[in-house]
Amino acid sequence: MTYQQPDAKGFYGKFGGQFVPETLMTAVIELDKAYREAKEDSSFQAELDDLLKNYVGRETPLYHAKRLTDHIGGAQIYLKREDLNHTGAHKINNALGQVLLAKRMGKKKIIAETGAGQHGVATATAAALFDMDCTIYMGEEDVKRQALNVFRMELLGAKVFSVTDGSRVLKDAVNAALRAWVAGIDDTHYIMGSALGPAPFPEIVRDFQSVIGREVKRQYAEISGGKLPDAVMACIGGGSNAIGMFYPFVNDKSVAMYGAEASGLGLDTEKHAATFAKGRPGILHGALMDVLQDAHGQIMEAFSISAGLDYPGVGPEHCYFNEIGRATYDSITDEEALEGFKLLSRLEGIIPALESSHAIALAQKVAAKMSPDQSLIVCLSGRGDKDVMQVKERFEAEAEGK
């Protein structure tokens, strides 16, 4: 049976939907209508394709990581090089698509949330390109962790609003951005950065990010004589790079799909972001999905060395994949991710983002159990420039025995 999700109400099985206040329903309905029309408009897709090719630099390479493969001694590992996109990560695929959509809707202002800053930079970039007013909401903790990306956003002409509510991280930035959207509904478009939020956001983000998996499918077929890979893998916070990798393979049952979520200091602590391992269904940011919550249903704080993965929920389509067993999700600790960060740097000369390092760490475990005639494709979602100082300080502190 061909996979057809979401349904007309924006649900993936029991997950997703539109759990938003009445004040936002108008905007959500308007967005849904505009998106359906844009999807059917070949000129919209042609403009986006042109930007992806000539501005972003797509298609990105599918690179055979031979030294990493030899080191692990299992499956042939290929890296989908989303780190080579303009702005350094997969986030630009979605940001450009949504700014084009906002322009089509006649909106003049763009707002967005960001954690690691990559979505903020991508959104500020797209807004600069189309001469649109841009405000980025970012948790105060992330503003400190990602000072370089904050400067990049400001350099691109965006205003960065430091959010001091709650735990001052990504979920609080989403709350602030949603509030700002309510206040400026007539002239403002909110660009959700991950496959989260009320319908149609998870579907929009999935569709714009699916360029990743579509390219992989074509590229791998070219080098393998028309075959499909045995497995695909990506890190998962909200889940946009993972859904972009997975979705084009969802009907190919022979292709295993793996997501690497962040278990921070460990699943036996409260310092993690392992929603599938430790969460349960609840409503957050306008959708029903698996979330980290306490016994009273209060959303718990997520924790990860990676600013892009410390979100206490996972997008609804991933929740559905997890429930029906279509994808397998495993958790990776900070320490394992740091080892992955070092390993890829030293073996392949590629410094990955800390988010992507979680996928590299999981790839070591999964590839080792596979045979050399099998293939595993890992989405290298972003480059590690933004994380180098943070990792440097961490290694120095460890060397001093702190």
From Swiss-Prot:
Pathway named in the protein's UniProt entry: Amino-acid biosynthesis; L-tryptophan biosynthesis; L-tryptophan from chorismate: step 5/5
Catalytic reaction equation(s): (1S,2R)-1-C-(indol-3-yl)glycerol 3-phosphate + L-serine = D-glyceraldehyde 3-phosphate + L-tryptophan + H2O
InterPro entries named among the record's database cross-references: Trp_synth_b_CS, Trp_synth_beta, Trp_synth_beta/beta-like, TrpB-like_PALP, TrpB-like_PALP_sf
Modified residue annotations for N6-(pyridoxal phosphate)lysine: K91
Alphabetical list of SUPFAM superfamilies matching this protein: Tryptophan synthase beta subunit-like PLP-dependent enzymes (SSF53686)
Stored Pfam families: PALP (PF00291)
Cellular component aspect of the GO annotation: cytoplasm
Keyword Lyase: yes
Keyword Lyase annotated: yes
Keyword list, A-Z: Amino-acid biosynthesis, Aromatic amino acid biosynthesis, Lyase, Pyridoxal phosphate, Tryptophan biosynthesis
Signal peptide from the UniProt entry: none
Cofactors, names only: pyridoxal 5'-phosphate
CDD domains: Trp-synth_B
EC code: 4.2.1.20
Any one GO MF annotation of this record: tryptophan synthase activity
Annotated family: Belongs to the TrpB family.
Quaternary structure, from the entry: Tetramer of two alpha and two beta chains.
Role, per record: The beta subunit is responsible for the synthesis of L-tryptophan from indole and L-serine.
Name used for this protein in its record: Tryptophan synthase beta chain
Native source species: Streptococcus thermophilus (strain ATCC BAA-491 / LMD-9)
